[in-house]
Curated annotation (Swiss-Prot):
Compartment(s): Cytoplasm
Family named by the database record: Belongs to the MnmG family. TrmFO subfamily.
Organism: Rubrobacter xylanophilus (strain DSM 9941 / JCM 11954 / NBRC 16129 / PRD-1)
Known cofactor(s): FAD
Gene Ontology biological-process entries: tRNA methylation; tRNA wobble uridine modification
Enzyme class: transferase
Region Disordered, residue ranges: 398-421
Gene Ontology terms, MF aspect: flavin adenine dinucleotide binding; tRNA (uracil(54)-C5)-methyltransferase activity, 5,10-methylenetetrahydrofolate-dependent
Reactions that this protein is recorded to catalyse: uridine(54) in tRNA + (6R)-5,10-methylene-5,6,7,8-tetrahydrofolate + NADH + H(+) = 5-methyluridine(54) in tRNA + (6S)-5,6,7,8-tetrahydrofolate + NAD(+); uridine(54) in tRNA + (6R)-5,10-methylene-5,6,7,8-tetrahydrofolate + NADPH + H(+) = 5-methyluridine(54) in tRNA + (6S)-5,6,7,8-tetrahydrofolate + NADP(+)
Basic and acidic residues bias (residue ranges): 406-417
Chain sites annotated for binding FAD: G8, G9, G10, L11, A12, G13
Protein name: Methylenetetrahydrofolate--tRNA-(uracil-5-)-methyltransferase TrmFO
Amino acid sequence: MPDVTVVGGGLAGSEAAWQAARAGCRVELWEMRPVKETPAHHTDLFAELVCSNSLGNRSPETASGLLKEELRRLGSVILRCADANAVPAGGALGVAREDFARAVTETVGSHPNIEVVRREARDIPEGPAVIATGPLTSDALHRKIEELSGETLYFFDAASPILHRDSIDDSVVYRASRYGRGEADYLNCPMDEETYYAFVEELASAELSPIKKFEEDMYFEGCLPVETIARRGPDTLRFGPMKPVGLPDPRTGREPFAVVQLRQDDAEGRLYNIVGFQTRLRWGEQKRVFRMIPGLQRAEFARFGVMHRNTYLPSNRMLEATMKIRNALSERPLFFAGQLTGVEGYVESTAMGYIAGTNAARVARGLEPIRWPEGTMMGALARYITTKEGTLQPINSNWGLVPAPPKRENGRRLGRQERRRRQAEMALGVLERFAGEVLRPPVAAGR
């Protein structure tokens, strides 16, 4: 019998299994694919990225970048594989989608303390367990979780289309990263005013894949379908995912009226995704409307954009900040991780997997689970989703979660950039002390 069972081989489950195994526990990692498929996955690999191939900003002076740096310093297997399979993406950490997932699968699956079991979990396992089945939890397990929680919440999420590189017109697109930061890693499709408004009109009126009427507004605000943004007003897109600022066309020296950006999706550069163009348009409509974009008139689609329902828990009424279920609901040593807990984002899901896996291993060894300090981005996220008043909405890492730095000695506030830099320094300092004093040196050193 394993010391810890982890259900779900996504980002959070893979991280949880790895951390429990690092702590010396025998781990069974259950993944139902390919025995039972989901509406959004295309492979049976662990940590398959079903939406964007970007893990967010690299800089530790951004909230997303700080979270990644915390995980790196703690020895995250997901960040190790992401860094090893990075593709050009300007200031973001973009990864070669399949190479990254394959690396996680091989790394996690080859750990001597981890046994991979390909099966559907129809009930909650006995003993210390981490449920990290994500937003596409199977119906049978979903019912068992609802018996514990009394309810689950949900929203809709969508993925952007992926194009074949050789079908993109190089005489129209140009390479650039916004404000010239880093390498010129993005392909940019420039639009003039007339083309832009014609495109927005067609996009806003295009035929959608059906969902129930009452579900039409149940989207995560940070990942809205591009057609939903278009319906909010004719200029909304060019101040959002199609904003041209910092992207002058080298042929004219001027910024276009609007820009559609394409980001490399694989290591070889054969595939590019349309940045910020998650959609629930019917596939035929995606071809028709997106081929109106300059440079994409003959674009061939490797994958169309798709939409799926994301389930998450009322963690503020159900979980402790350790990711353990509250004793009032169950005295079982049961932990939850990933998007199922109400965080939004690949790295945020990974962070909750790290916490849950570490604490499941502690309980298996007869120790109490531990809370991450709130001065870290990891701890602040865990605290927010487990203490939020009212209805919990999915949340990304953001600076509002961690303590602000003190003002200058003269009482004046710090500038924005200096404030973020100091917040990051404070958080990483707290993390280093926590890792050395509480997690113990073997974990802190990344062994």
